[in-house]
Swiss-Prot record:
Subunit structure: Forms a complex with integrins.
Protein's UniProt keywords contain Transmembrane: yes
Residues in compartment: Cytoplasmic: 1-13, 77-85, 223-238
Membrane-spanning parts: 14-34, 56-76, 86-106, 202-222
Subcellular compartments: Membrane
Alphabetic keyword roster: Glycoprotein, Membrane, Transmembrane, Transmembrane helix
Entry's family note: Belongs to the tetraspanin (TM4SF) family.
Protein name (record): Tetraspanin-4
GO BP terms in the entry: mitocytosis; regulation of mitochondrial membrane potential
Amino acid sequence: MARGCLQGVKYLMFAFNLLFWLGGCGVLGVGIWLAATQGNFATLSSSFPSLSAANLLIVTGTFVMAIGFVGCIGALKENKCLLLTFFVLLLLVFLLEATIAVLFFAYSDKIDSYAQQDLKKGLHLYGTQGNVGLTNAWSIIQTDFRCCGVSNYTDWFEVYNATRVPDSCCLEFSDSCGLHEPGTWWKSPCYETVKAWLQENLLAVGIFGLCTALVQILGLTFAMTMYCQVVKADTYCA
């Protein structure tokens, strides 16, 4: 009976971790594709230049693949050490995500202030050598969200030391349109515009976060259940 339960949990554990590993492969693949085709796309922070979409996806994908691999081998080999390692790693990830979420909501005002200051510092790197990712990211954000600057289009005046903005701030794009009158530029601040967009899509973000948490809890349950079954089977055989 104990052996039959163990086999059932074993196959469920293996299937779960195989999907987990394949998901990591997909995330890693997207990260590598972004790095190869878009450079350091979406690098907006001057304090953390390596914090790009591509790098985040590559690190996340690699870590998920590693955890999934440990889980798969642990399930196939019915290895208590690997199963416990998988459980501990996944539990640490879950606790880290929960801690980050709590801190984010607890210090949202301070994070807002710091983020705006850091983004304004990053504006000074716009268009400079070695900062193609930051330049592309700002151009895309200002064009797609129809905004200009972090808190105001005048943020760019300090960057250029002139009454000028990037061409991506223009209502109607044309070469050197950023040198025209302010009436031809977008007036909405990018930080508040993007923040409002995220708040409008908060339900989707919440559902994604909830699904992620449920998957992790499922993985923890499978791992601990199988670990206990392996211990019982070993005791029964002894």
